[in-house]
Amino acid sequence: MTDPEISAVETVLDNGKFGTRTVKFETGLLARQAAGAVTAYLDEDTMLLSATTAGKHPKDHFDFFPLTIDVEERMYAAGKIPGSFFRSEGRPGEDAILTCRLIDRPLRPTFKKGLRNEVQVVITVMALNPDTPYDVLAINAASLSTQLSGLPFSGPVGGVRVALIEGQWVAFPTHSQLENAVFDMVVAGRVTETGDVAIMMVEAEATEQTWDLVRSGTQAPTEEIVAGGLDAAKPFIKQLCEAQVELANVAAKPVQDFPVFLDYEDDVYDAVEAAVKAELAAAMKIADKQERNDRTDELKDEVLAKLGEQFEGREKEIGAAFRSVNKQVVRESILRDKVRIDGRGLADIRPLHAEVGVIPRVHGSALFERGETQILGVTTLDMLKMEQQLDTLSPEKHRRYMHKYVFPPFSTGETGRVGSPKRREVGHGALARRALLPVLPTREEFPYAIRQLSEAMGSNGSTSMGSVCASTLALLQAGVPLKAPVAGIAMGLVSGEIDGQLQYVALTDILGAEDAFGDMDFKVAGTREFVTALQLDTKLDGIPAEVLAQALTQARDARLTILDVMAEAIDEPEEMSAYAPRIITITIPVDKIGEVIGPKGKIINQIQDDTGASISIEDDGTIYIGATNGEAAEAAKNAVNAIANPTMPEVGERYLGTVVKTTNFGAFVSLMPGKDGLLHISKLRSLAGGKRVDAVEDVVSVGQKIQVQIAEIDDRGKLSLVPVVEGDQADSDTAEAGSEEE
């Protein structure tokens, strides 16, 4: 066997005072039977393998490009054994799914249009510095392995994460550095023929520290700052693309001839355009989505019937051409007349509605509507021990704020599968979570696990941004003290030549059809002061800076309008629901934790059983006590304090105790965990109507609750008790006890 021919190239990204990051690409050693394979390294201690493979035969019955991106997180990469029952990795976690989406979004548009062969890119995380995010390295590795594969691919695509730290945009920041970042942004793009970088995808968010950093005087991530971050990412993207090209020039396979299946031929398009364009233009002015869709469906059926004989066997082409004509009609109306599908102006927002408390008994609920998009937000609060436990390669091991997004088929008037979330739903939930994370209270300020569910009740454009609005309302109604309300809006862009001039038109609050027919999907969420999350996907080779600035300005204006409407529904946290748990926080010495827990959990379980409260103990001695009513939580707090922060009991103090043991000379009564006293048989007369008591069991039994008072404490701390009865009986018994002893 001959030695493999290994080729490699590396590039060093300079972050100035923050040091350098070295990215290395290598091919020829691993996965040699894949069409293209690349090993990518970041600073020699993080290693990914990306392998691209194409199916041998096209799926000509598909009307889409069958591209699959898979990310495999190997736990050995971090020196861990999986925590599952079978100790295997199992299904991909949320981080892996989100990384798949990050790769798919910029890669998919770069394949040749009409390709129908199945293409699969598998990225395996093989070694990982726990302080290093691997997602942007995976974008570059997937791009390069695809370039080497011989597929018709117009890459390379470069991806970089830049974070705003101490006023500087830092490339490939570590998790430690991100703790001091104001804004975190993943940007992907490619180098154009002019040498400029065309941005294809952006995924960005403020951090959990942003609010405090801004309050301490750090520059807030405003729209202008975010636009500057996009420019700062371009040199790094260009550098990574050049490194990919250098290796591809040495190791890439020749581009193979793959059959291309165009959606339609020109003759079909011309016939469809002549037959239906005028009527389609009228149909696309119908404001109501359902009526508009019904009319376009009618027109499509008419065209199929009219042209079916002329183009026999080419019905799929007629359908595709119909969609293309529809797209052209919508775009021309926007570019020429500045009029949109539903008759709105370019910056107009659809009618807004917001209300809270729409579901009984739940801890918080809200309904947010923007036109035909309708989102239900529901908040649930619980003890911190109910926060999500994560067994992934990420340093995040538990998640206090969980945000789930559900998109049922009825939200678009269709039937379909319900159940486990698809990748799109995972992505939308993650986007809404990132938008709200910077304004959530800390664990110390609000010691609750928070689960937010966003349900799309109706969909016609940007349910993800609607989820942000509905969630803000529901959280406030649940009593969560947000630092500021957050709203989101989806922007669009249409470009084209009109009378020989290239025009760009930014659209506010896009419909579903405008999203499909436009050139950009741009979602922006934030407070009144700054941006908290941003997501951008574009089909263009580049967006001029002034066009992007205009879109950001329109988004800010729309966001402020939406926040005003939300404030009319609720503008500050309400009182917590009577059905939500009440949580009390206390701190005990660390060396007392064992005493509170007791042998095999005996003491803590007894406190929980006696009071009905739930208790969670942190390693630092912080104890969270939760109960559905304040009395139970207070009783549990007193019981814990009696053990961990004890005060010596005094004669005359009264307790509601529990009989834990009976003997022939009396009953032992537990006043609190770890503190018992003796109720002598002679003191039971008052409970027996003043009669002599021959057997303790005739008066009290184990488990019985009894009100007692401390009559005496001896030198060894032993407690003598007397029962408390109505009137002054307890006091007379105490006096009688003293006279008998005399």
Swiss-Prot record:
Molecular function (Gene Ontology), one example: polyribonucleotide nucleotidyltransferase activity
Subcellular location as annotated: Cytoplasm
Key word Metal-binding present: yes
Positions contributing to Mg(2+) binding: 515, 521
CDD domains: KH-I_PNPase (cd02393), RNase_PH_PNPase_2 (cd11364), S1_PNPase (cd04472)
One annotated Gene Ontology cellular component of this protein: cytosol
InterPro entries, sorted: ExoRNase_PH_dom1, ExoRNase_PH_dom2, ExoRNase_PH_dom2_sf, GPSI/PNP, KH_dom, KH_dom_type_1, KH_dom_type_1_sf, NA-bd_OB-fold
Cofactor or coenzyme needed: Mg(2+)
Similarity section: Belongs to the polyribonucleotide nucleotidyltransferase family.
Role noted for this protein: Involved in mRNA degradation. Catalyzes the phosphorolysis of single-stranded polyribonucleotides processively in the 3'- to 5'-direction.
Protein's UniProt name: Polyribonucleotide nucleotidyltransferase
Organism encoding this protein: Nocardioides sp. (strain ATCC BAA-499 / JS614)
